[in-house]
Amino acid sequence: MTRSKRIYVLDTNILMHDPTALFKFEEHDVFIPMMVLEELDNGKKGHSESSRNARQVSRFINELIESHGSSDISEGITLIQPKGLNLRAAGTVGKLHFQLKQTEPGKRFGSVLPDNLILGSILQLKEDNPGVPVVLVSKDINLRI
């Protein structure tokens, strides 16, 4: 059975629980909605473990962008593990993608809430990538429903 390439959409709570989650999806691509970046930015203040993890995710993303160079990020950034982080054997790696288009969740979900913005970005991602499985990774049971 061949495994097709998938796109994993990471929710804020996954990254605030484990900042290395970015690098744990092998050859598959990872997508981070704009709302997740905003929630990480809001969550980085403080001394709690989740605040430290939010800051670490930001450092990982910054390092990836800097190593990517000045070329266009719209095609994705190769998910090369940072130095000192040994999570998997060498092999094919996916790319990190960011939400580049604004969605209008009010048209689909009514209220403009963070979860609705994330769901709107997932639906847009599915429309933009027909035939590619898109998987939400979240600890939020209601969001997964």
Question: Language-model segments: what does each one mean?
Answer:
Residues 1-5:
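Non-catalytic pre-domain segments flanking phosphatase-related domains
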Residues 7-135, 141-145:
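Active-site-proximal, substrate-binding regions of enzyme catalytic domains
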